């Protein structure tokens, strides 16, 4: 591999590390918001557990769990790409 191509791939790797860091930060933020939503829901009075607010909170929490899982998968995928590119320039 010539120096120019190698340097370009190293630049791509650096960009991917930045993206992965942002994805991880988003993952943490979504997880924290989900914990807050769960705490909100379970601190509701029992007589509200069958109401619309509780149901909406459950749905939001479920959606955030799905988003969190997808963000984790994305982070793992980005790291795999980085590993392959690092092997290519090694």
Where are these regions (language model features)?
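Long, low-complexity or tandemly repetitive, helically biased scaffold regions used
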Residues: 2-90
């Amino acid at each position: 591999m010539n120096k120019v191509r190698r340097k370009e791939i190293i630049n791509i790797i650096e960009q991917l590390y930045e993206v992965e860091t942002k994805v991880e930060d988003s993952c943490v933020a979504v997880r924290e918001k989900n914990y807050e939503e769960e705490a909100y829901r379970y601190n509701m009075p029992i007589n509200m557990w069958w109401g619309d607010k509780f149901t909406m909170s459950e749905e939001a929490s479920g959606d955030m769990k799905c988003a969190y899982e997808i963000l984790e998968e994305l982070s793992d995928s980005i790291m795999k790409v980085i590993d392959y590119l690092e092997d290519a320039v090694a």
